Amino acid sequence: PNDSGYYQFQLQGGNYTLSTQSNVPYFNWICPPSLISVNTYDTATVDLPLEITNYCPYNTVSVTSPAFPFNTTSQINVLACNNGTLFSANTSVEVELDPALSFVSSIPPPIAQNGQVLTFDLDTLDILECVGIRILAQLDTLTALGATHCVEARIFPDTICGTMPWTGARIQAHATCNNDSVVFSLENQGADMLTGKNYTVYVDDVIFRIAPFQLDSGEVMEIREEALVGATYRIEAEQEPNFPTYLGDSIAIAFFEGCAALPNGGFNVGFITQFYLGTSIPSQTIFCQENVFAYDPNDKLAQPKGYGPDHLIYNNTPLDYTIRFQNTGNDTARRVIIRDTISPLLDLNTLEVGAASHNFRYDIVRGNILRFIFDPIILPDSGANQLESNGSVSFRIQLQPNLPDGTMIQNRAGIYFDYNPPIITPYAFYTIGSDFVPLNVSNTISEILPNNQIKVWPNPFREAVHFKIEGPSQGPLRLTLTDLQGRQIRQKTLQIGNEFVLQADNWAAGVYLYQIDGPEGPLASGKLLLQP
């Protein structure tokens, strides 16, 4: 709708259902969906009554950047909006720059700078008002090529009215580098955890450790991992069931890249952005991307990038897209239009348009074409002004629910400079999957006696795991299963050559240790991973 609440659609003749949806929890839709019939060259008028349930600001913030080019100035764009039902007084935004980015200037200027944190005073945001912040920063010339840089932003006030106070635990995750170790800390900022949950540690693109944790209110748990040379570390810690999205995601996430450098001073890159960063809180956001030496100036980026060449993601992962454009012609562009045909596997009802480099408006045409209109834009050509010739716009969208594994989601955008033919971006695509991250859990850690073959499958497992031992050892054999705290979970007798099935009856997900002993002594030991 426009500022007066009026809306219009251009439709082909036919029957339609018209309803309203909002991500803002301050409205009550008091009427059922409207059924309308439109004839050719006809106009239908429909009112959509709604009731305001809370008069309160609903402040959101988003961040995007065309690129973090190596050894040159970067443009960072922040969009702060009040989508609530009441003006937002004393509004401010904090932006924390990556350690490798040095602040150069901004419009508007910050009212304070504390290290890498910039504070901007927005005074009062009216209902449905948005304010842009444009920051210029310089990338450190000594940073590794391809390193990931993150910009975080938070808007205040950040209260969401009408929500039930959360009375459960609230886990926060942090990551630091301490000499030769990556140190994760899990802090419970809520009530005592009633049950244990699991945390998972990733090293680059494999799962390195899964272990349980349970924290009382205010308790902090430190997890220290010896840093492998060049590796990227990430931790995911489960929140309690029904954890509200306005407080964060169902997992707490932290990561650290390049704690222990390679001999050449570099480190493994590209692993942070292939996973979801965890940004569901409306008043907070984090934007991460790798620095580049050269890049396609007109493309469509997706975050997370997805795992491996198939860009695997888990079902129900929120998707953040950034469309980048640059005027590489020989004259100023005065209008840019972007048309992005949204895949039917994405839910347009969940669309959230984010930050952009220039003022724009957007609409949806022909059912599923998302259109961004920058008119006027006055975009100089790259020969006249390399920095100012770039632009970008971002949006978030959710997957359709419960897509089956193997589903591929792909789409691309067309970028129109003035009245020239469109530049078509490469496809951005994902594949839905599960259990695609390999685990550093060997089926057999050690086979102590030779000539004995121990088979354990599947591993990881969910409901049951199979054991089979073949070899010269004489039975019976004893299988002992313990958790990581050394508590015995199960003990069974096995026979050489026979297959044994171990059922996971009400076990907690996580890593378990097994040992097989025979008359001659220990035969083998290993790890099992029970998945949720």
Which role fits each region the language model picked out?
Residues 1-445:
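Exported/extracytosolic protein signature
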